[in-house]
Amino acid sequence: MPDTTGGHPAALKVVTLDGPAGVGKTTLARRVADALGIPYLDTGAMFRTMAWRLGPDGPDLDEALLRDRLAGFIFTLRGRGGASVLSCNGEDIGNEIRTEDVGAMASRIAALPVVRECLKAAQQRMGAAQPLVVEGRDMGTVVFPGARHKFFLDAAPEIRAMRRYTQLQTMGEAHDLALLTEQIRSRDEQDRNRAVAPLRPAADAIIVDTGDLDIDGVFGVIMQHIRSRDGL
């Protein structure tokens, strides 16, 4: 298993951004990666890709069969900054995984220990090979507990639902705001109460409430902490 406790030089440069859906993790992770000139890894896209490829019956597969299927997914990362591209089995991951249905399936498979075990190993391999900005739900607590910089982003469900509603509109998808709010509350409960790698901030994470700040404001807070600690 790769050393994620700080012994590997690259591990010192891992920046983790954790938090629930709708707090701006993706946008912020891309910007931070651009500012630092290092690759960006969207771990949520890895779960979504597995869910999309496994299909609706994926979470119900026999564990041995599921483990065999998971072994066939090879993730690679190329490029730097926000333009980093994640691929699965040689195919770039696109917007086909960004639907609400795929997100719901991803939340289900994310609760399975065998799935988290598989992706944790893949993510740690990437972090051991190079500095990274990673976003997810358990990056600072489980995958990269020795990361030099850890942030946990949060906001009220209503604020996050509105952000998601606006995002889906730009993608040409129509959704009911009240339903989105309820879905976010439900996913929060599922993510925070699951037995494996529940959503929670690391003990040494900087907690940022994104509800009262725009993207520029949150980005400024994150970069100030990074530069202060690194003496930049």
UniProtKB/Swiss-Prot annotation:
GO terms for molecular function: ATP binding; CMP kinase activity; dCMP kinase activity. ATP binds at residues 19-27. It comes from the Bacteria. The keyword Nucleotide-binding applies. One of its GO terms (cellular component) is cytosol. GO terms for biological process: nucleobase-containing small molecule interconversion; pyrimidine nucleotide metabolic process. It is found in: Cytoplasm. Its EC number is 2.7.4.25. The keyword Metal-binding does not apply. Keywords: ATP-binding, Cytoplasm, Kinase, Nucleotide-binding, Transferase. It is an enzyme of class 2 (transferase). It catalyses: CMP + ATP = CDP + ADP; dCMP + ATP = dCDP + ADP. Belongs to the cytidylate kinase family. Type 1 subfamily. This is Cytidylate kinase. It comes from Nitratidesulfovibrio vulgaris (strain DP4). The lineage of its organism: Bacteria, Pseudomonadati, Thermodesulfobacteriota, Desulfovibrionia, Desulfovibrionales.
